Amino acid sequence: MAKKRIAINGFGRIGRLTFRNLWEMDDVEVVAINDLTDNATLAHLLKFDSAHGKFNHDITSSEDHITISGTKVAASSERDPSKLPWGEMKIDTVIEATGVFRTADQAKLHINAGAKKVVISAPGKGAGITTVVLGVNTDDASSDSTVFSNASCTTNCLAPVVKVLDEAFGIDKGSLTTTHAYTSDQRIQDAPHSDLRRARAAAYNIIPTTTGAAAAVGKVYPPIKDKLFAIAIRVPVITGSMIELNVITNKETSIDEVNAKFKEAAGSHLKGILEYSTDPLVSSDIIGNKHSCIFDSDMTNVLGNLVKVVAWYDNEAGYSARLADLVAQY
């Protein structure tokens, strides 16, 4: 069977880490990269990563290729996706990782260029996009849609947790706080930004801001729609984040009962997606962990039908691993 042919549009943090995952898979091949940055810089950033370490391959670049251990990957710098040679290159799936082309019409520029399918590495904007969180609404990945979204890193952590709790106890309502590593959508030093809190120095401040995870989880797990609100707290770590979810359940429970449900899920239908931990974790402990969420059983608290759970996630490694899985398997 022929390998699935993949192109990546946008070779930033998620694009490069997803490339690393795909490169180790047998049934796919990344044949093209499109990014406005010069190829020498892209090759260097693919090889060396401050958070995730060295990509142990011989990597070189030329005017129109990046070569990894002798295998050439076409590399271009085209601003208009409709002008990319996806038909000529027989591209099966484009990973849209620029963060720019997030509507269905924008993503379909890749379809117009000859690709069969597009997966957006961010929450989609507007209608006509099938959002998938593996382990939660995996069946939707097999739909006839041509434009998909891998949701967000926080939604990929939150949705499996919500699904376990709701199926076991029923969720009436709740609140989410994600304590999140800083990202490129913040300023290193105080500088203008449309969000005045994100305008402040990322490595120096605790920064309250917004997250769309509470709304997004309702798209992939409809029973929870309109039952959660959320806030994000950006903190000065390079990667490694956590969610604290507080919910009112429809029936009373206990710490042991809650933890048992998550342990069961981690060993069965959410294996590889959700990890069950009994260790006293801190954020650096989960850097490089490819699970969507790492359930911290020691942090569970219950007061009647008020339940608090905590789950960790490497907002880069976990998310890019699921993105690679989605692209490779569906």
Pin down the residues of each PLM region.
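N-terminal Rossmann-like NAD(P) cofactor-binding subdomain of oxidoreductases
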Residues: 2-199, 323-329
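A generic structural signal for well-ordered coil/turn residues at beta-strand boundaries
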Residues: 62, 128, 202, 239-241, ...
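Short clusters of hydrophobic/aromatic residues that line enzyme substrate/ligand-binding pockets
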Residues: 66, 132-134, 147, 189, ...
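Hydrophobic alpha-helical scaffolding
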Residues: 151-152, 206-208, 313
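C-terminal active-site/capping subdomain that shapes the small-molecule cofactor and substrate pocket
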Residues: 230, 242, 246-330
